[in-house]
């Protein structure tokens, strides 16, 4: 279960990196948003069967998806300083998500 939840987040981050920095077309932006929504939906359904304490994993992943979408917006506006700060925040949020997933599941 831990591997599954961590792998989904890593795949989302890879797709987001490609759509934000490498392939700047509308189609990849739409796919990134759809994948983020589906990731949140799958994680919400997965954590429904666990105690309330495990909802922290969902909240942290929600913050990660929101941060990635803000990064995409900042990259669209060519704010490189903001993008660098948001990339560091995304890395920090992913580390927190990783630790919570290992500890709670």
UniProtKB/Swiss-Prot annotation:
Disulphide linkage map: none
Entry keywords, A to Z: Membrane, Transmembrane, Transmembrane helix
InterPro entries registered for this protein in UniProt: MspA
Description of the deletion phenotype: Decreases cytolytic toxin production, including alpha-hemolysin Hla and phenol-soluble modulin (PSM) toxins, perhaps as a result of repression or lack of activation of the major regulator of toxin expression, the accessory gene regulatory (Agr) quorum sensing system. Reduces abundance of staphyloxanthin in bacterial membranes. Significantly more sensitive to treatment with detergent, sodium dodecyl sulfate (SDS) and more susceptible to penetration by the DNA-staining dye propidium iodide.
Membrane-protein topology: Multi-pass membrane protein
Residues in the Cytoplasmic compartment per record: 22-29, 77-84
GO CC annotation terms, alphabetical: membrane
Subcellular localization(s) per the UniProt record: Membrane
Descriptive protein name: Membrane-stabilizing protein A
Protein species of origin: Staphylococcus aureus (strain NCTC 8325 / PS 47)
């Amino acid at each position: 279960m831990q591997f599954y939840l961590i792998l989904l987040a890593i795949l989302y981050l890879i797709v987001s990196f490609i759509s934000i920095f490498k392939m700047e077309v509308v189609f990849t932006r739409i796919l990134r948003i759809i994948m983020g929504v589906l990731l949140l939906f799958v994680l919400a359904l997965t954590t429904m069967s666990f105690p309330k304490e495990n909802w922290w994993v969902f909240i942290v992943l929600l913050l990660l998806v929101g941060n990635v979408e803000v990064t995409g917006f900042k990259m669209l506006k060519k704010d490189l300083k903001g993008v660098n700060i948001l990339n560091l925040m995304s890395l920090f949020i992913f580390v927190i998500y990783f630790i919570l997933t290992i500890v709670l599941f």
